[in-house]
Amino acid sequence: MEYRKIGDYTLSRFGLGTKRMPITDASRVDRLDREIAAEIANEAVNQGMNYFDTSYSNHKGEAESFLGDYHEAHSSDTCLIATSFFELVDPRYMYVFQKQLKKLRTDKIDFYSLEGVCDLNKMRDIDSGAVDFLFEQREAGHIGCLGFSSELSPDNLRDFIGRYPWDFVRMKVNYYDWFNKDGSARYDVANKFNLPIIAHAALRTGAASALKPEALSILKDANPDRSSVDWALRFVKSLDGIVSVTCNMHSVREVKENASVFNDTATLSPEELNVLEACAKAQREA
């Protein structure tokens, strides 16, 4: 497993997301299957992963509680915790933060981010006082690294980064948006500020494994043995500005298969990037 630095932290380039952990009751997302969830987390550690991403609302808060228990049972180097605040879920940022510390069983959250920063509400967390409060918590030692999850246009992203001394930015990075939208422009903005990027949605929330036949055939013709998920993860891995990419996984098998992409040294060649560009175009036009 390759590792990168953000501040004083050394984190794996592949991280475990907790948005779709296994549950015991299909009608209750808060009924986390903790036994299988622990097996997934253990396999992630076995694969060299140490970055565990959650949020206040994942599984109605049960994901944070699970990671708190898991973190307490393991060393801090084994399990770095990342969580976030989303004002539309609960605007009481002071209350939410204190509750998160309690659920995560810690007095310091390694990575903390503001969720849902987009063009329509880019001033919301600033005007509410949430941003200043969180920087105070970082100064007090209750947050290790502070960032935000961006849905901003490149111009607004440039402005938002320049307002505060952020430690990182989370953004969607995948080959479909890269070649069809402004994914590369947002990536370039963060890089110009030397702001580390933690990527998510590398699989486009599942679309990478549900390609239309015209797009899938392009990948299969180029490499019959490589899955569409492998292509998608390897694309993000090949971007040097990406410090880590998180993926929501719900089985041990999925962890093993996906982590294998980050446990070898291969990145995509220029020719393979051309293949993905053709695939993205075919997916859009099909």
Walk through the language-model features, giving the residues of each.
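Conserved, mostly hydrophobic/aromatic
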Residues: I6, L16, A44, F52, ...
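N-terminal binding-site loop/beta-alpha segment at the start of enzyme catalytic domains
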Residues: M1-D77, F133
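Acidic (Asp/Glu)-rich catalytic clusters
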Residues: G7-T10, N46, G68-T78, Q98-D107, ...
